[in-house]
């Protein structure tokens, strides 16, 4: 496959030909970054079957091509297959996945793979990429789709952050309000009021150091009460992955500070 669309600003035939190129875009999520040659099977460039002699020669070329690939390349291929599977389940955009692949390549270059599973490291890289791009996905979300224990994922994430000196910002709590409310099909007014509650909490400086998901769930719970939507704290706990005790404590603090509801 070749990308033959124009990608330059050549305004004469000579300048256009100097700047022109063909070929698909490269990607960090490919084990070879999309730069290697792929040997086709049993058909020529026009789609016609090739002769038995040519088929035998190409089979030998294909065999040696596979043998020449390093263990590192094979490892990348397996890791990025896992990454694409997680991307599909989590509904994450390509630029975040590219970022995750970049982080994972740095993990391999730093030789952090010893004693750690590939699935956990690729999942930790994906979580770090989500944090860098403020995509609201929790450790529990990543652990679930990656079929990994949360404590193992958390441990490997701490290692990656420390060794690679990543500077991950805290999540924007408002993004979790949108995520939880959409998943629970809450009314638009309930969501808007939850944003207002969050804004008031930030002005009162009671959000610092608090779990953003718990803060979002508590704001939505209070907003539901104000708008007559009867949803239990237990349901919010299940949907957000936060214990109902934590949500109850956050709700109590918000009610006491803002005096919104009795």
Where are these regions (language model features)?
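Non-catalytic, interaction-prone regions of core transcription and DNA-replication machinery
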Residues: 1-262
């Amino acid at each position: 496959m070749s990308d033959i669309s124009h990608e330059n600003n050549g305004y004469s035939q000579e300048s256009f030909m100097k700047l022109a190129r063909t070929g698909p875009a490269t990607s960090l999520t490919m084990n070879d970054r999309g730069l290697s040659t792929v040997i086709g099977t049993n058909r020529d460039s026009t789609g016609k079957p090739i002769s038995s002699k040519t088929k035998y020669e190409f089979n030998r070329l294909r065999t040696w091509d596979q043998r020449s690939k390093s263990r590192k390349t094979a490892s990348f291929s397996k890791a990025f297959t896992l990454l694409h599977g997680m991307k599909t389940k989590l509904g994450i955009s390509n630029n975040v996945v590219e970022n995750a692949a970049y982080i994972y390549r740095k993990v391999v270059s730093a030789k952090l793979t010893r004693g750690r599973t590939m699935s956990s490291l690729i999942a930790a890289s994906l979580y770090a990429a989500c944090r860098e791009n403020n995509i609201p996905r929790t450790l529990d979300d990543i652990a679930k789709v990656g079929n990994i224990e949360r404590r193992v994922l958390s441990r490997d994430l701490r290692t990656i952050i420390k060794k690679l000196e990543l500077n991950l910002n805290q999540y924007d709590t408002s993004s979790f309000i949108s995520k939880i409310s959409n998943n629970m099909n809450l009314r638009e007014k309930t969501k808007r009021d939850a944003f207002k509650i969050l804004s008031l909490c930030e002005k009162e400086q009671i959000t610092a150091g608090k779990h953003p998901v718990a803060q979002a769930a508590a704001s939505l719970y209070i907003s539901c009460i104000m708008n007559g939507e009867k949803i239990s704290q237990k349901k919010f706990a299940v949907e957000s992955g936060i214990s109902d005790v934590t949500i109850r404590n956050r709700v109590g603090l918000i009610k006491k500070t803002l005096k919104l509801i009795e």
